């Protein structure tokens, strides 16, 4: 395994006035800050997408309908709607978790910014001090060099004048050489003083540079670790959401396994059956066969008219015979026993169709039902209803909270 390299050993520059290593490190930290923002933006957009998706799933589940279905498929569809809503809620919760992770990253990024700013301020100070003293030192060195050259020139001139010059020229040259030497000595003193100050500034800068490199490396280590963990957690959150979705949909699959197609068909037939026999064929009737030969001494009256009159009398409460009619006619209009039984039997069937409960019984609604017209009643699963009339066609008259209407009898169970 490769040994861990250190920033403090790899980001120096031989140019005294250059700070390339520090600038490279600082740019790396700024690039890392941008990377943090990129990850935050990814989490922000994913959270928005999860929230939109979750809310749309909830709306889809609540508007799915399915009230026209019944029995086991209705149960499975209701389970699908419920689990779809649960999946939507889970995705909304995932969006909240992503926003919490986003908030943590933002706080981490701001903490790193504050720490980096402190070191930037220190480095700016020591770098400016070093550069300023370096410039001052170089100027003093330049002055020192010039003073030394002037002193050398003055010394050489003094030596030439001393060999063959006048006393006055010798003294003048000697004084100039002395002054130049003193100026050179002073320039050397200033130069040495600046060198010492520059060395102290350089030492301070070097120490701060090492400290800053170590701090920047620690920041980079923390940033990489935090972002790696954040991406790992993000992937785990998405994977867990997939598992959660599958668990919720598994509940739907379990209800679908119990869906009985034949049972649903049988249940529909039992609750909605309209009869077991088809209508009888319509017989041919000869127009002239409807006329009946009248009896001797009685008026010519068709039997069908007598049947209609008797049927009307039963419906409206009129007497069986008309007082103004002759006795002979009354006897003639009396139908045969077979026809009489047919007429009365048909009326009795109509009068007794549907079992009217003398005392209303309580039933519980097994399913929701939405009224399709004004004479039906809306019910919800669990409602307690009083059954007034059990219709043979499968539609029962019920009462709830003072309201009456028709509901499917198969939707109720007796308490």
UniProtKB/Swiss-Prot annotation:
MF annotations from Gene Ontology: actin binding; protein phosphatase binding
Tissue and organ distribution: Highly expressed in adult lung and spleen, and weakly expressed in testis, muscle, kidney, brain and heart. Highly expressed in spleen and thymus, moderately in lung, brain and muscle, and weakly expressed in heart and liver (at protein level).
CDD domains found in the cross-reference section: SH3_PSTPIP1 (cd11824)
Keyword Cell membrane applies: yes
Transmembrane listed as a keyword: no
Entry coiled-coil feature ranges: 94-133, 162-215
Membrane topology, as annotated: Peripheral membrane protein
PTM annotation (Phosphotyrosine): residues: 344
Entry function: Involved in regulation of the actin cytoskeleton. May regulate WAS actin-bundling activity. Bridges the interaction between ABL1 and PTPN18 leading to ABL1 dephosphorylation. May play a role as a scaffold protein between PTPN12 and WAS and allow PTPN12 to dephosphorylate WAS. Has the potential to physically couple CD2 and CD2AP to WAS. Acts downstream of CD2 and CD2AP to recruit WAS to the T-cell:APC contact site so as to promote the actin polymerization required for synapse induction during T-cell activation. Down-regulates CD2-stimulated adhesion through the coupling of PTPN12 to CD2.
Name this protein carries in UniProt: Proline-serine-threonine phosphatase-interacting protein 1
Classification lineage: Eukaryota, Metazoa, Chordata, Craniata, Vertebrata
């Amino acid at each position: 395994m490769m040994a861990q390299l250190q920033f403090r050993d790899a980001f120096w520059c031989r140019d005294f006035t250059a700070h390339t290593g520090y600038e490279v490190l600082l740019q790396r930290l700024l690039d890392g800050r941008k990377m943090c923002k990129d990850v935050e933006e990814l989490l922000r957009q994913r959270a928005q997408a999860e929230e939109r998706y979750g809310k749309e799933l909830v709306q889809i589940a609540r508007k799915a309908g399915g009230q026209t279905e019944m029995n086991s498929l209705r149960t499975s569809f209701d389970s699908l709607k419920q689990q779809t809503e649960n999946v939507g809620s889970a995705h909304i919760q995932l969006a909240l978790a992503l926003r919490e992770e986003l908030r943590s990253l933002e706080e981490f990024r701001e903490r790193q910014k504050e720490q980096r700013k402190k070191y930037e301020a220190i480095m700016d100070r020591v770098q400016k001090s070093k550069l300023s003293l370096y410039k001052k030192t170089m100027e003093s060195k330049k002055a020192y060099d010039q003073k030394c050259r002037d002193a050398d020139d003055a010394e050489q001139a003094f030596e030439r004048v001393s060999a063959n010059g006048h006393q006055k020229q010798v003294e003048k040259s000697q004084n100039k050489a002395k002054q130049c030497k003193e100026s050179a000595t002073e320039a050397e003193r200033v130069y040495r003083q600046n060198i010492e100050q520059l060395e102290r500034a350089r030492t301070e800068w070097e120490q701060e540079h090492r400290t800053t490199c170590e701090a920047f490396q620690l920041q980079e280590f923390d940033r990489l670790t935090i972002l790696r963990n954040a991406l790992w957690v993000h992937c785990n959150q998405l994977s867990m959401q997939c598992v959660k979705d599958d668990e919720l949909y598994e509940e739907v699959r379990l209800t679908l396994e119990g869906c009985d197609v034949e049972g649903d068909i049988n249940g529909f037939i039992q609750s909605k059956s309209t009869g077991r026999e088809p209508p009888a064929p319509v017989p041919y009737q000869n127009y002239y066969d409807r006329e009946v030969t009248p009896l001797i001494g009685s008026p010519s009256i068709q039997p069908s008219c007598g049947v209609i009159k008797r049927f009307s009398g039963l419906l409206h409460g009129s007497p069986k015979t008309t007082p103004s009619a002759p006795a002979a006619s009354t006897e003639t209009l009396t139908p045969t026993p077979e026809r009489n039984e047919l007429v009365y039997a048909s009326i009795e069937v109509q009068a007794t169709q549907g079992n009217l409960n003398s005392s209303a019984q309580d039933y519980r609604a097994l399913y929701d039902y939405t009224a399709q017209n004004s004479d039906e009643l809306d019910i919800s699963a669990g409602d307690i209803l009083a059954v007034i009339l059990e219709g043979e066609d499968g539609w029962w008259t019920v009462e709830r909270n003072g309201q009456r209407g028709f509901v499917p009898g198969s939707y109720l169970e007796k308490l």
